[in-house]
Amino acid sequence: MRSLIAMYQRIGLVPLIIIGLVLGVLIGWLAPNIGIALGLLGTLFVGALKAVAPILVFVLVMAAISQHRSGNEVYVKPVLIMYMFGTFLAALTAVGASFLFPTELVLVNAVIEPVPPANLKEVLTNLLMNLVANPVNAIAEANYIGILAWAIIIGFSLRQASDTARTVVGDFSDAISQVVKWVIALAPFGILGLVANTVAETGFAALAGYARILMVLVGCMLFIALVVNPLIILVKTGKNPYPLVFICLRESGITAFFTRSSAANIPINMNLARKLGLHEDTYSVTIPLGATINMAGAAITINVLTLAAAHTLGIEVTFASALLLSLVATISACGASGVAGGSLLLIPLAASLFSIPNDIAMQVVAIGFIIGVIQDSAETALNSSTDVLFTAAADPKYAR
């Protein structure tokens, strides 16, 4: 048994994930019933990540702040600036792609259970209410804005505590981090189950009718990941950005693509930041915060599908209205984590800028759910890998 574990560890996580991916595709295609059964592995893996992530963030941030000493610089502000700037550039990219490759949709009728926010004020109100949520509820409901707020407050108060108390908090943080490493080590089995179940249930046949809109969406996300983000990193660090970009895509993006959850990928990103030797006082804050507000993929989804609806209805989109849409999408995307249904349920809000009827907007949302197996996966991979990418770019190890 020990020899098997040693061999498993020796092969390395990324090769094992690739093996799990290939096996998942084959099993889901050749033996759908087995693929659906294996879906339990994926459900358990994602569940374990989601379970450990809130307590990891709470303890890690609390420990980092309580043990912080004056004179030790943190680099949160430049990361937040890159988050917002990157999201806005993603929104502009989506607008440009929608003009270059205008897409018309075949609208469908479907019942969407979650209620979309009525306006931007409601999105921002939800975000602020998350900030003052009960700390126990925040951890139980994975409300990362609330978790961060309480962890920061308690961390500051613990600075006045004894050295023994702060040591206990630090030791508890190390223990939680070890649990995360054990969960991450099971990623190949989780990916196997997720892929096998997805291929078995959908076979991707349902996506064929929406190939063009998918190409625009995924094309925008690839452009951000491989062109725009590297340019931001180049300007920030003055170094070749691609080694760091590919590390983040490989170590964070692949897992995020299959879990389809930025929250579940927080432990993965924390572990990667630690491997990269980044400043713990910084990444313990910016990575969970990024999972909440760094939403370049969400901005792309909102703009591409909104403009596709406008093109379908023959609505003229001016430069001014496109710029306004980009601003609204950037702000709305930052609140996407506080909206049931995420970025898709913010489409009616964006569509209202062009006086698109709500029933039409909800049909566009329905299309979003149909293509979600690809759209949501690519969106999460971009969002989550960018969290650790921008955090690394602001770190003294990489910064200019």
Curated annotation (Swiss-Prot):
It is found in: Cell inner membrane. GO terms for molecular function: neutral L-amino acid:sodium symporter activity. Its main location: membrane. The keyword Membrane applies. Disulfide bonds: none annotated. Involved in the import of serine and threonine into the cell, with the concomitant import of sodium (symport system). Belongs to the dicarboxylate/amino acid:cation symporter (DAACS) (TC 2.A.23) family. PANTHER family: PROTON/GLUTAMATE-ASPARTATE SYMPORTER, SERINE_THREONINE TRANSPORTER SSTT. This is Serine/threonine transporter SstT. It comes from Psychrobacter arcticus (strain DSM 17307 / VKM B-2377 / 273-4).
